[in-house]
Amino acid sequence: PTAGLHFTPEVLASIDAAGVDREELTLHVGAGTFKPVKADEIQGHEMHTEYICVHRETLEKLIKHNAEAIAVGTTSVRTLESLYYMGVKLESGLELTEADLHVCQWEPYEGPVAATAANVTPLKAIQNILAYLDRHGLNSLHSSTQIIIAPGYNYKIVKMLVTNFHQPQSTLLLLVSAFLHGGDWHKIYDYALSHDFRFLSYGDSSLLIP
């Protein structure tokens, strides 16, 4: 939510005037997102469940743009990337409830969902969700996610990221590191520190492009 603070009504109006499609997502941020990573290995850090809501119009816009998006904030990232794995679960053809679509912390990395994902494009995953809404007469998807995005994660939907500067030993910094494929985040943060950028929720922002 805090990355969006940089988008004033004037900025949003200019984006709309340029013909850029934009949508809003809902994710109820869990405390685990901000809990410092104290474990020696990331496998020892537990993410809390976060509840999400995505409207039909957002899914239709994603399909229009081949399931590619610029995310504003790490909250949007977790929502969009979780959508992909929810769509992967629907590829099975089984009749699932919205609760069944919950994305567990390590599902993108290992197990049957990760194996199925190898054969499901982001576009197909979003189409699966839209078809699910059609079958059940729903206008929005309500589900949950425990996803953790860390180095080694393969981004599916998010192609660019607008985000603030995060504190050390945080899952948010892990997410940024994964987005930039490892090393480049050090250079960005060194530059920010040497030029007195402001960090955290009310600080400066960045546009990250892998």
Spell out what each predicted region is.
Residues 1-210:
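Surface-exposed, charge/polar-rich loops and edge strands
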